[in-house]
């Protein structure tokens, strides 16, 4: 009789998960046409030539808004599972989450005082 250990299914899955993309990329490399013309290295927007330079500078305020958004988005991702299991985790987890939110509020106050949230 064939005995399967506890982790053999994992290793088989990992092997198959590695082989499928490798085989797909290999077949694509063999079958796909290769064109190395100058058009391959040009940039385009929605199928047409770009208007102006493709590399533009944007103002730092967009970066700061994106950074603040990501910080509070990550906060939401961490707080939601905690809120769903609040009864099981108890007071120590509440204190940890309070410290986590307090650190984020300090970061928000810092960004606010530096003027990162001003749109002018």
From Swiss-Prot:
Leading EC class: translocase
Transmembrane segments: 7-27, 64-84, 89-109
Chief site of localization: plastid
Entry keyword annotation includes Chloroplast: yes
GO terms for MF: NADH dehydrogenase (ubiquinone) activity; quinone binding
Subcellular location: Plastid, Chloroplast thylakoid membrane
InterPro entries, per database record: NAD(P)H_OxRDtase_bac/plastid, NADH_UbQ/plastoQ_OxRdtase_su3, NDAH_ubi_oxred_su3_sf
Gene3D superfamilies reported for this sequence: NADH:ubiquinone/plastoquinone oxidoreductase, chain 3
Gene Ontology biological process: photosynthesis, light reaction
UniProt topology in membrane: Multi-pass membrane protein
Catalytic reactions of this protein: a plastoquinone + NADH + (n+1) H(+)(in) = a plastoquinol + NAD(+) + n H(+)(out); a plastoquinone + NADPH + (n+1) H(+)(in) = a plastoquinol + NADP(+) + n H(+)(out)
GO cellular component terms attached to this protein's record: chloroplast thylakoid membrane; NADH dehydrogenase complex
Keyword Membrane appears in the UniProt entry: yes
This enzyme's EC code(s): 7.1.1.-
Keywords: Chloroplast, Membrane, NAD, NADP, Plastid, Plastoquinone, Quinone, Thylakoid, Translocase, Transmembrane, Transmembrane helix, Transport
Family: Belongs to the complex I subunit 3 family.
Functional summary from the UniProt entry: NDH shuttles electrons from NAD(P)H:plastoquinone, via FMN and iron-sulfur (Fe-S) centers, to quinones in the photosynthetic chain and possibly in a chloroplast respiratory chain. The immediate electron acceptor for the enzyme in this species is believed to be plastoquinone. Couples the redox reaction to proton translocation, and thus conserves the redox energy in a proton gradient.
Subunit description: NDH is composed of at least 16 different subunits, 5 of which are encoded in the nucleus.
Name recorded for this polypeptide: NAD(P)H-quinone oxidoreductase subunit 3, chloroplastic
Source species: Anthoceros angustus (Hornwort)
Encoding gene per record: ndhC
């Amino acid at each position: 009789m064939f005995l399967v250990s506890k982790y053999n299914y994992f290793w088989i899955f990992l092997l198959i998960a590695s082989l499928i993309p490798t085989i797909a990329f290999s077949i694509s490399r063999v079958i796909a046409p290769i064109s190395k013309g100058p058009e391959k290295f040009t940039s385009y927007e929605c199928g047409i030539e770009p208007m102006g330079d493709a590399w533009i500078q944007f103002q730092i305020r967009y970066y700061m808004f994106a950074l603040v958004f990501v910080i509070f988005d990550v906060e939401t991702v961490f707080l939601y599972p905690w809120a769903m299991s609040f009864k099981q985790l108890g007071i120590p987890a509440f204190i940890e989450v309070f410290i986590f939110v307090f650190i984020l509020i300090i970061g928000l106050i810092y960004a606010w005082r530096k003027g990162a949230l001003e749109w002018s």
